[in-house]
Each structure stands twice: as structure tokens, then as C-alpha cells.
Amino acid sequence: MKDHVVSGSIRSLHHGLRKLFSFLPKPIRFSIYRSFVDCDPAPDPRLVLKIAETQEELEACFKLLHDAYVSSGFMKPDASGLRVTTYHALPTTTTLCAKFDGEVVGTLSLIRESVFGFPLQAVFDLSEVRAKGGKIAEVSALAVHPSFRKTGGAILFPLMKFMYDYCTTFFDTRHVVIAVNPDRIEMYESLLFFKRLKSSFVANYDFANGAPAVGATLDLKELPRHLKRAFQGKSDRKSLYHYFIKLTLPNIEVPSRRFYTTNDPVMKPEMLDYFFNQRTRGFDKLDDREKALLYSIYSLPQYGKYLPIGFSHSDPGKAARQQQRYSFKCSGLFTIELAGQVETYTLTVVDCSLHGFLAHAATPVTCQVWGEVVVQLGPHEESRIRALAVGRKKDAGFYGFKLAEPDLTWRKFVATLEAGTTQDDMDNATRFLPD
């Protein structure tokens, strides 16, 4: 009884302090938030930040998330003890985890926009974000183990730094968006310079069990400038500019990249089955359109027996245009000789097949003239092929190219894009070459 009274008094005190804090002018509130920053440049080596890629790591992340959401009222308890959403099945979603002494103690998921969209766009206006260009990802499914919630950001700050590093270096993402509880939004605004979206408040956010939510966005391209201005003159430990932009955190395990792919699919067929058919019945909740899209992503035979049944189309694999499991972004140079003059164009290759590719060019490209294209497919993987720009696409600056005879490096790359299932397969591309 006594403990109950004490805990109730503490809650009342916290509520009163929050109310008093809210009456302060916003610049003062933001300054107070920033004064609490304390970033450890050399965390305990037992802390490891990595992509959750094994069944065990993902299950630990989903369990931590479930328990955190239940305790906060963001979901009702699930019999599985896990919070797993359809978005976690997609190759465009990456789950990051923080492990301490081998145990998952923090997690967040990055849901990049795909044919499934992402949760937030159903209720918030993203028109201003889209107008700036660049890919968008939703930061979702954030949870920290109770044992580390009062440690001054010992898990949260490294996890957020990992998110920033991953999005800007590997995930080809310019904007991140969030939907957070109104009580938390000022922390994101003051420390990371999130800006509220149009019509930013939603009283009942279905993705969080009807809890209120505020939508906000962060332009990662602009973040260094904001952080430098806000934390100018601060010591390294008190500066998020130093922490996010200048510091290399030794605890972060960066993903390997043989090729310049921009996502990290981890869902092997058996893992899809385990999380969405066995531990949960997630696939049972999909409508026909969502099932068709799932088939269009996982069109390989080894996935077929695990995908949802009851699909009404006679051939589910043809119900939607086949979607890529891998995304990539490779630089290239296209050179032609025309009337004795050499012309060279800088390209960014974003889609490809065995005998062609789609690329963006900064300047207009002369079409219907054969030349040579050199594409940097990876840090140590270069393809040099005779090519022809066949025409400009409707989208500004995009051109289709035809290849005369793809070389070995190009064939390895395309074969793995078509037949691979996870990021690990990209590191073993030779085995996907046809006999």
C-alpha cells in the first residue's frame, strides 16, 4: 500500500513538473533539452549496433518492441509476444538493433517507401517533403530495454547515430519521417531538428492502437548545418554535431557491400514462414491487393509455399508488376564520338537487366549513337560495355540504354539481382551465374 502511494506521488510530481515546463518559452525549453546531451565517444565495447539479420535477432527485436508498446498502451498484448507488421516482411525495411553483452536492448525499423507505402502516409500530408525530392523512410518500431531507459541516452543516442549513418551512407534516403506521442515530439524537434508536418496532429493513430500522434520530418541533407549551428562552442561530449557528423563510433558494425546496393533484405523464405505464418498470422490479414504485391516482390519459387493462400488471381505472380528485392545506385560514364568530337556524360544507374539499364543523366544525352559505358557497380566491381542510349523517358533526365554484349561483372550483378534473396547473396554473386 505504501509503495503504491509513493509511486502515485512520484507520478503526480512528474506530471506537475512537465506542466510547469510546458509554460516556458519554446527556445528555453529547447535549450534545456540540449543541455542534457551527453554523448559517450567510446561506449562500452559490449555495446554493438548492427542490422538485425538472423531469426534470433529479429525475434528479440520484435519481443522488445511488443513489450514496450504494450506497456505504453500502443498495442494490446499479442499471444505471440511479438509485434511484427507487414512492413517487416519487405526488403525495403531494415531493422537496426543495439546489443549489449549479446542481448538485444534497443531497436528501430526503417521503412523506406515502396509499393506498400509506409504507415504514416495514410494519415499525414507529405506533399512538402516530396516536393524537395529524395527518398523517404519512416522511422518506426523504436524501443529501448527498461534497464537502459534511464541511462541518459546510452542506447538511444548510438541507435540514432547508426540510423543517420545508415540512411545517408547505405540506404539512399534523404528524408526520415516519424509519428510520435505528443509528449515526445519536442525532444525530436530540439535535438534532431525534426519539423512538424502539415496537419501534424492525429488524435487516434491506428498504427499505435488509437493513441494520439504528431507527424514530423527531418531532411538529413540539412541536419549537419542545423547541428553545427545549435551546438557551436560545445565540448565534444555535449555536441550532437560532433557525435553525428564527425565521430566514427567503433561499436557500429557497418554492412558489407560488394555492390552498391541500397537496401539490406534479410528475410529468407523460412524466416518469412516463421514470423508471418507460425509465430503470428500476419499474412492472413492481407487483402487481395497486398497479397498480389507480396507475390510480385517474392516471385522466386522458394518463397511460393510460404506466401498467403486464398489469392483470387489465377496466377498471383502476374497480378502485379514484378518488384525488385534489391535497390541500387551506381555511378557511370557514357562516352561517344560524334563528328570527330568526344562527348562524355555522367550517369547514375538505377535499374538494369541483362541487356540494358535505366540511368539519370545530369545533361541531355545524344541518343542512337553507340559508345562505351563504364559503370562502377561496387567499390571493386567495374563493368565496361559497348552501349547505346535508345531514348529519353518521360521522367526528367532519365534515359534507357541498350547493351551490346554484357561483360562478366555485369552478368554476375544482374543474375544476383534476379535470383538472390538476401544481402549476403550479393557477396556471393558468382554462384548465381547460369551454367
What label would you give each PLM region?
Residues S140-T151:
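A short, internal acetyl-CoA/4′-phosphopantetheine-binding micro-motif in the GNAT/acyltransferase core
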Residues K150-D165:
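Conserved acetyl-CoA-binding loop-helix of GNAT-fold acetyltransferases
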Residues K2-S12, E57, A79-V84, L96-A98, ...:
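Structured alpha-helical
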Residues S9-Q55:
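Conserved N-terminal entry element of GNAT/NAT acetyltransferase domains
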Residues D206-L218:
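Phosphate-/nucleic-acid-contacting segments
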Residues S35-A89, T95-C97, V104:
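Short amphipathic alpha-helix that is part of the acyltransferase structural core
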Residues C167-A179:
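Conserved GNAT acetyl-CoA-binding A-motif
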Residues F116-F118, R130-E138:
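A conserved beta-turn-beta hairpin within the catalytic core of GNAT-like acetyltransferases
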